Amino acid sequence: MSKQISIIGVPMYLGVGRRGVDMGPSAIRYANIIERIKSVGHEVKDLGDIEAYNSEDVEVGNLKFKYLREVVAVNTDLAQQVSAIISEGRFPLVLGGDHSIAIGTIAGVSEHYDNLGLIWVDAHADINTHETSSSWNIHGMRLAASL
């Protein structure tokens, strides 16, 4: 069965505080993800990238929630876009970026499903809070934020 897929890139790195992961969406596109998905019979619409912030342009803010304002802003935008894609009957494929983008992805999907399940596969639980985190990077708090 053919699916209609919409791709959103989120070149975010402030959740981890290290450059490099922000190149993920570009690298995945460069690796020809769109043509590969089309080759198995799906229709793909690339919506481009959500605007993310650079650490050079913003303050770290509260050290127990590094770059909280910016991470929240990007994830709010992402949640709205994911929800809109699902409302159109399409499947959202989100390319990141650091792990904090799971917050917006889960929030957008959860608007459409009352009994949403999530399978979380990661080397870490990522359920830290500002009280349990040793780094205070939000990418390690994303599952706690989503719950």
Identify the residue ranges that each predicted region occupies:
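Conserved alpha-helical scaffold segments that buttress catalytic/binding sites
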Residues: 2-147
